[in-house]
Amino acid sequence: MKELITQKLREIEKENKVRILLAVESGSRAWGFASPDSDYDVRFIYARTREDYLLFDDVRDVIELPINDALDINGWDVQKTLCLLYKSNPTLFEWFSSPIVYMETPFAERFRNIMMEYFSQKKSLYHYLSMAEGNYREYLKGDIVKAKKYFYVLRPVLACRWVLSKHTPPPM
């Protein structure tokens, strides 16, 4: 599957005239509790051409591929990524700490080195608490609940605990 994902990422680069700087797995596979029917949640950061950044027209800052049963692929432009870092976006911190990396350039390591300067415990706690509450409402209110769905509530609660005790972004 890794070869197929890498091939799809190369196609994205070619079709969109971008360069992928980092591509990782996000979701249950990266969290370590994938089920046999889990899809691949591939997330990436990309850079457009220099000319694109000099345009006065708005250029879309997200690339999303249609979701199928096996693959869910989307990415953010590096400019959007920088804005999200400034806002201490917890999802961004997760992507850069994913244990499953499909593509990586030297940019990724340089970016990791500055991320902690922008980490906000408060924003992280709000994010994970909101995620736990939303997942609880969506997944645990039914009569029959799959065991995996409990992890979708437990993981953000444990992330909050990590942030409160370690004062750092939680590991993926």
Predicted regions span which residues?
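Helical scaffold of the NTase/Pol beta-like nucleotidyltransferase catalytic core
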Residues: 1-24
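Beta-sheet entry/capping signal
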Residues: 19-22, 41, 161
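Short His-Asn-centered micro-motif
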Residues: 26-27, 74
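A basic- and aromatic-enriched beta-loop-alpha substructure that forms the phosphate/nucleotide-
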Residues: 55-131
